[in-house]
Regions:
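Active-site and donor-binding regions of nucleotide-sugar-utilizing enzymes
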Residues: 96-118, 127-215
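Acidic donor-binding loop of glycosyltransferase active sites
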Residues: 304-315, 325-326
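Conserved core of the sugar-phosphate nucleotidyltransferase
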Residues: 1-47, 57-68
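A nucleotide-sugar donor-handling region in carbohydrate enzymes
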Residues: 77-79, 197-252, 273-274, 278
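Short alpha-helix at the nucleotide-sugar/activated-sugar donor binding site of glycosyltransferases
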Residues: 113, 303, 321-322
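Catalytic binding pocket for nucleotide-activated donors in carbohydrate/polymer assembly enzymes
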Residues: 317-348
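Short internal beta-strands
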Residues: 122-130, 269-274
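Donor-nucleotide binding loops and adjacent catalytic segments primarily
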Residues: 239-306
Length: 348
């Protein structure tokens, strides 16, 4: 009854939205007794109201932290909610920004999507992204735990995220300049000359000479395979060859190298984003030596099955070495060629 009366006594939007103030802000009309909540309910520093889109996304993280991959049909307990509010992803949300432009390969996007799954981070993919494998790769990662809401297409606002991570190879000046005004920025393997806008530089893949010093350079962060060749396996003839020149193969080298290897009587497995299209371009007499497969999930754990891995300079090259394979690199760009030569890889 008091609430009904209060509704007709105020025109203030704040009173109507929050309800309670319509009572306790008008002591001449209503008597309110403020009782302290029991300790387990009394957390004045926690905020669970949703007033902005950022608040909504924060609530989604809370739900994900509590429920994990389960579809809970019961109310959350206060302990679960309080514990979730202390989770790192809720306190300090992270945004990953990969390169999603045609010709840059899929490695940058893969790395950011994996970071998002493991750290409940968001991934910024603009609406004009033209990476051909974008949709299929995101769908595959959704099967591994990525939530649809973790992909955002709107540019972040100031202080919306505690940290922005870029994985761009060579980020445009205006983009990194804009990001630096919104949040601290950490850049992975950044090759541009605009690193003065970055707060932290992490170099993982050994690079060509750069006119700057990273905060940390450590190839130990390359995710090496657990499954490796035995010494006996390493002594067999080099007949089984894997061709994997990036998820995008921007230089279209998979076809000619596969044909050349098949002509040398090698048993070739080639990874292609468009297996049927690639198959049409292979001479009929060579099809018996060439097997075409779509992108392989967790490829690094299958590299040991091959004697030689043909790829370009990047994670797969180091993973193949660790797996005990012979490695042959293709010069997909001049920079890839320089890097392959600098670090002692066999190069075509």
């Amino acid at each position: 009854r008091s609430m009904i009366e209060a509704c007709g006594m105020t025109d203030l939007a704040y009173d109507h939205e929050h309800v309670g103030p319509a009572l306790y802000n008008h002591p001449n009309d209503f008597a309110c007794t403020m009782l302290p909540a029991p300790g387990k309910w009394n957390h004045p520093d926690y905020r669970t109201t949703i007033d902005t889109y950022a608040d909504y996304r924060r609530a989604l993280r809370i739900v994900k932290v509590v429920s994990g991959n389960r579809n809970l049909r019961r109310p959350f307990t206060y302990e679960e909610i309080c514990n979730a509010l202390e989770h790192k992803s809720v306190i300090n949300p992270i945004l990953c920004i990969p390169s999603v432009s045609k010709g840059h390969g899929t490695g940058h996007l893969r790395r950011c999507l994996n970071l998002a799954i493991k750290n409940l981070a968001d991934v910024y993919i603009p609406t004009d992204a033209n990476l051909s494998e974008l949709d299929s790769l995101v769908e595959k990662m959704e099967m591994e735990g990525l939530e649809k809401w973790q992909i955002i297409s709107e540019f972040p606002t100031s202080k919306e995220y505690s940290l922005i991570i870029t994985d761009y190879f060579s980020i445009p000046k205006q983009l990194i300049k804009d990001l630096s005004t919104l949040s601290p920025v950490a850049s992975i393997d950044e090759g541009s000359s605009f690193t003065q806008y970055c707060d932290y530089l992490l170099d993982i893949i050994p690079s060509a000479k750069l006119n700057r010093v990273a905060n940390l350079s450590n190839p130990g962060f390359i995710p090496l395979p657990k499954t490796r060749k035995s010494k006996d396996d390493a002594l067999v003839e080099n007949n089984k060859v894997l061709v994997s020149i990036g998820g995008e193969d921007p230089a279209n080298l998979s076809l000619p190298i596969s044909i050349a290897l098949a002509e040398c009587n090698k048993n070739v497995t080639v990874i292609s984003a468009n297996p049927l299209e690639l198959r049409k371009q292979i001479p009929d007499d060579l099809l018996k030596n060439i097997r075409i497969v779509p992108p392989v999930n967790n490829l690094k754990e299958r590299l040991y099955m091959y004697d030689i891995v043909v790829t370009h300079y990047g994670f797969t090259a180091f993973e193949a070495l660790a797996a005990g394979c012979g490695v042959l690199l293709m010069e997909t760009t001049s920079l890839h060629g320089v890097l392959a030569h600098k670090y002692g890889f066999a190069l075509l």
